[in-house]
UniProtKB/Swiss-Prot annotation:
GO terms for cellular component: plasma membrane. This is Probable G-protein coupled receptor 21. GO terms for molecular function: G protein-coupled receptor activity. Glycans are attached at residues 2, 8. Keywords: Cell membrane, G-protein coupled receptor, Glycoprotein, Membrane, Receptor, Transducer, Transmembrane, Transmembrane helix.
Length: 349
């Protein structure tokens, strides 16, 4: 078995992107830069999301916050898992052999990303129930049922990819930065079809069906409200501003997150299907599509922070609290600092 960090067996280390190897640094420079950069972004971004959710109570009013926080924790674990290939590429010795390391890494990342995919599907179902059954929503969607659903998401995602340890085939290309995974662990067309039929296809169909109906119903509600306002305004001689469906704006935020997820994952899924069915492989394509898909773990943070006003207020409140605590800590350390008698002006969320 070849090792990616054993310099005695090869003149230079194994690199998926051969163009990124430099003799001066003796490691795969381009791969290290991409993976370490994404790892830092994913970990820092999702830590911020988790802290904001804990510090902004208004964000927890929606039941979808359960699933969004689940995605944030799963994405955070993706970032932590990416430390393994980062350290391996930098020649830090791994605690277990390379074959087991890349299998476990590929399995863990596949499970975590499928948790995000299943959570997005559950979010769309939750919003669909809120739109179609508003009167019975609180009795249908309870905190206990949400926790049970999250537990089933983790269990189901684990079971879908568990056969990869029983010689069913490779679940993805996440571990291909290790030489054993790239050269000795191959995909299987039947296992790939199994993953697509059990996870990718159902999640995509659920999302398409629910959001199509959500926006259709919201459009109908908006039209009815506009017609009623027009009749009322004509009777009273007043003009009112048209109102939109109250759930449509929040659904748009979730739809953006879902759309970006599938846009970033679509090249990976297409390549996964083509490579496992035809046997034609490309190291460059597998690396780029895989890490493009993994980059979604950071994109969720960006979309939510830019689209959700409550999240923005929570983020400002968190940053304000941190700045205030840092300022008070600095003032306490400096005995010559003149302290104000009154509390600093500011709003707390």
């Amino acid at each position: 078995m070849n090792s990616t960090w054993d310099g005695n067996q090869s003149s230079h280390p194994f690199c998926l992107l051969a163009l990124g190897y430099l003799e001066t640094v003796r490691f795969c420079l381009l791969e290290v830069l991409i993976i370490v950069f994404l790892t830092v972004l994913i970990i820092s971004g999702n830590i911020i999301v988790i802290f904001v959710f804990h510090c902004a109570p208004l964000l927890n009013h929606h039941s979808t916050s359960y699933f969004i926080q689940t995605m944030a924790y799963a994405d955070l674990l993706v970032g932590v898992s990416c430390l393994v290939p980062s350290l391996s590429l930098l020649y830090y010795p791994l605690p277990i052999e390379e074959a087991m390391t890349c299998q476990v890494f590929g399995f863990v990342v596949s499970v975590l990303k499928s948790i995000s995919m299943a959570s997005l599907a559950c979010i769309s179902i939750d919003r669909y129930i809120a739109i179609t059954k508003p009167l019975t929503y609180n009795t249908l969607v309870t905190p206990w049922r949400l926790r049970l659903c999250i537990f089933l998401i983790w269990l189901y995602s684990t079971l879908v990819f568990l056969p990869s340890f029983f010689h069913w085939g490779k679940p993805g290309y996440h571990g291909d930065v290790f030489q054993w995974c790239a050269e000795s662990w191959h995909t299987n067309s039947y296992f790939t079809l199994f993953i697509v039929m059990m996870l990718y296809a159902p999640a995509a169909l659920i999302v398409c069906f629910t959001y199509f109906n959500i926006f259709r119903i919201c459009q109908q509600h908006t039209k009815e409200i506009s017609e009623r306002q027009a009749r009322f305004s004509s009777q009273n001689g007043e003009t009112g501003e048209p109102q939109t469906c109250p759930d449509k704006r929040y659904a748009m935020v979730l739809f953006r997150i879902t759309s970006v997820f599938y846009v970033l994952w679509l090249p990976y899924i297409i390549y996964f299907l083509l490579e496992s069915s035809t046997g034609c492989s490309s190291r460059l394509a597998s690396f780029l599509t895989t890490w493009l898909a993994i980059s979604n773990s950071f994109c969720n943070c960006i979309i939510y922070s830019l689209s959700n006003s409550v999240f923005q207020r929570g983020l400002k409140g968190l940053s304000g609290s941190l700045c205030t605590s840092c300022a008070s800590h600095t003032t306490a350390k400096d005995p010559y600092t003149v302290r104000c008698k009154g509390p600093p002006n500011g709003s707390h969320i």
